C-alpha cells in the first residue's frame, strides 16, 4: 500500500476491502486523481471473488469536505465515465458498500456517502450542503437521491439552507443507517464482517432489488437536472 496516494486500498481480514480517502491536508476534498483511484479500487474489490463487502472511510476528523473547489476553478472536475462524481455516484458495484463517516461530510462528501448502501456515522459526524451558497447545485446525486431517503420537505430544508445537520438528526430522518458508539470506521468494519459472513449471492440479490426500486424513483430527477445544473456550473466557473 502506497500511503502517499490520496486514496488507499487495503484488506481487513479475508473478505472485507477498505478504501480510505487519504488527503487530510485538504480535508479529503475530491479531485480527479481521487475519483480515478476510487473507481479503480471499487472495480478491483468487485472483481475479487474473495471480497464480500467494501468499506469506504475517511480520516478520524473528516470524511470529505466535498469537491476540490480550487481544482474546479482551474477547470478540473472529479468526474469519471461512467461512474460520475468521485468514481462512485453511478458506479455499478454488485457488492455491498458501507460508508464510514467520522467528522464532516459536506457537499460532494455526503454525495459519496449517499451512493453507498449503508452509512455509519460517528457521534461527531456532521453533514452540510453548502452548494447553493456557492451558486452551485449538488447535481451528482443528492438532489435526486436525498428526497428518496428522507421526505422532500426535509431534503429541501437541508439543500436550500445549507445548515449543518448532526448525526442524530440525520438518523432520525433516515438519511443514515446508524450511529456508532466508537468510531464509524470500527463499526463499519464490524458490519462488513457480519455481511461478509452471509451468503454472497443472497446479499448481492438483496442489494440489487433494493437499488432497482430506488433507481426508479431517482431516474426522472437525474434526467431533468442535467441542463439546469450545467448552466449553473458554467456560470460559477466564470466567476
What is each model feature region?
Residues 1-59:
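Conserved CoA-thioester-binding segment of acyl-CoA-metabolizing enzymes
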Residues 19, 56, 68, 112-114, ...:
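Hydrophobic/aromatic residues within transmembrane alpha-helices
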Amino acid at each position: 500500500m502506497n500511503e502517499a496516494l490520496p486514496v488507499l486500498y487495503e484488506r481487513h481480514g479475508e473478505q472485507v476491502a477498505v478504501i480510505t480517502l487519504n488527503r487530510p491536508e485538504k480535508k479529503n476534498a475530491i479531485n480527479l486523481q481521487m475519483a480515478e483511484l476510487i473507481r479503480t479500487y471499487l472495480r478491483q474489490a468487485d472483481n475479487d471473488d474473495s471480497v464480500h463487502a467494501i468499506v469506504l472511510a475517511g480520516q478520524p476528523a473528516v470524511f470529505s469536505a466535498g469537491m476540490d473547489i480550487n481544482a474546479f476553478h482551474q477547470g478540473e472536475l472529479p468526474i469519471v465515465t461512467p461512474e460520475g462524481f468521485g468514481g462512485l455516484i453511478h458506479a455499478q458495484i454488485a457488492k455491498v458498500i458501507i460508508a464510514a463517516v467520522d467528522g464532516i461530510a459536506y457537499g460532494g462528501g455526503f454525495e459519496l456517502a449517499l451512493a453507498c448502501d449503508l452509512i455509519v456515522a460517528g457521534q461527531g459526524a456532521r453533514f452540510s450542503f453548502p452548494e447553493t451558497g456557492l451558486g452551485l447545485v449538488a447535481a451528482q446525486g443528492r438532489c435526486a437521491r436525498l428526497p428518496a431517503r428522507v421526505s422532500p420537505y426535509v431534503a429541501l430544508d437541508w439543500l436550500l439552507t445549507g445548515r449543518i445537520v448532526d448525526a442524530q438528526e440525520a438518523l432520525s430522518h433516515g438519511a443514515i443507517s446508524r450511529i456508532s458508539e466508537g468510531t464509524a470506521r470500527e463499526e463499519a468494519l464490524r458490519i462488513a464482517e457480519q455481511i461478509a459472513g452471509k451468503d454472497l449471492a443472497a446479499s448481492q440479490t438483496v442489494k440489487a432489488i433494493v437499488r432497482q426500486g430506488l433507481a426508479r424513483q431517482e431516474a426522472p430527477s437525474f434526467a431533468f437536472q442535467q441542463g439546469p445544473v450545467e448552466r449553473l456550473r458554467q456560470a460559477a466557473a466564470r466567476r
